[in-house]
Regions:
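Domain-level signal for soluble alpha/beta catalytic cores
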Residues: 1-170
Length: 170
C-alpha cells in the first residue's frame, strides 16, 4: 500500500507519490514487455485499504483521507496505469472519497471498486448490507464492482448473486 497513512509506520509517508508512480512504471514496463499481438495486458493501480476507516476514525478527516488517496492516484496515473482499482474496501465512504479524488484527476480512466465481505452473509465488512453499500457509491463514476475477500467460497457465491441482482455493472 503506497498511501501515506500506511507508510507512516515505516517513516515513508513523504514517499507516497514516488512509490505509487514507480510501482506503476514497473508494472507498465512488464506489460509492454509481455504484451504481444492481440494479447494485450493492462495495469491496474491499486488504491488499497487505508489504515483509517473514515466511519470509525477520529484522527483523520475526509479531506485528509482524500488528499492521501489523491497522492497515490496521481502517482499511479503519472506512472501509466490503465485503470484504478479501489480495493479491499470496508466502508462505502472510503471508496467514494477515493473515486471522487480519482475523477478530479482523470475524467476518463476506468475505476473498479472491490469490497471486503463480512462474516455475516450479504454484508460488507462494516456490516452494511450489500445493497446499501452499492447505493452509497458514486456508481456513475465506477466501471466495475466486485469483492476480493470473503469468509468462504459459499459466502462469496451468495454475495456475488446479490451483487448481480443489485448492480448493473460488470
Amino acid at each position: 500500500c503506497a498511501d501515506a497513512l500506511c507508510l507512516e509506520h515505516y517513516g515513508l509517508s513523504e514517499r507516497s507519490y514516488d512509490i505509487a508512480r514507480r510501482a506503476a512504471e514497473i508494472a507498465r514496463a512488464c506489460v509492454e514487455r509481455y504484451s504481444a499481438g492481440s494479447r494485450r495486458r493492462f495495469v491496474a493501480g491499486s488504491v488499497g485499504p487505508s489504515t483509517r476507516n473514515i466511519s470509525l476514525a477520529n484522527d483523520v478527516t475526509e479531506e485528509q483521507l482524500g488528499d492521501v488517496y489523491e497522492t497515490v492516484i496521481r502517482g499511479q496515473l503519472d506512472g501509466g496505469v490503465d485503470l484504478i482499482l479501489v480495493e479491499t474496501v470496508m466502508d462505502s465512504r472510503n471508496a467514494s472519497i477515493a473515486v471522487e479524488r480519482c475523477r478530479r484527476l482523470n475524467a476518463e480512466i476506468p475505476i473498479a471498486v472491490s469490497a471486503v465481505l463480512s462474516r455475516l452473509e450479504g454484508r460488507v465488512a462494516n456490516g452494511a448490507p450489500i445493497a446499501t453499500f452499492l447505493k452509497e457509491l458514486p456508481m456513475d463514476d465506477i466501471a466495475l464492482v466486485g469483492f476480493n475477500c470473503s469468509s468462504s467460497p459459499r459466502a462469496m457465491g451468495a454475495s456475488l448473486e446479490t451483487l448481480a441482482a443489485e448492480c448493473d455493472k460488470p
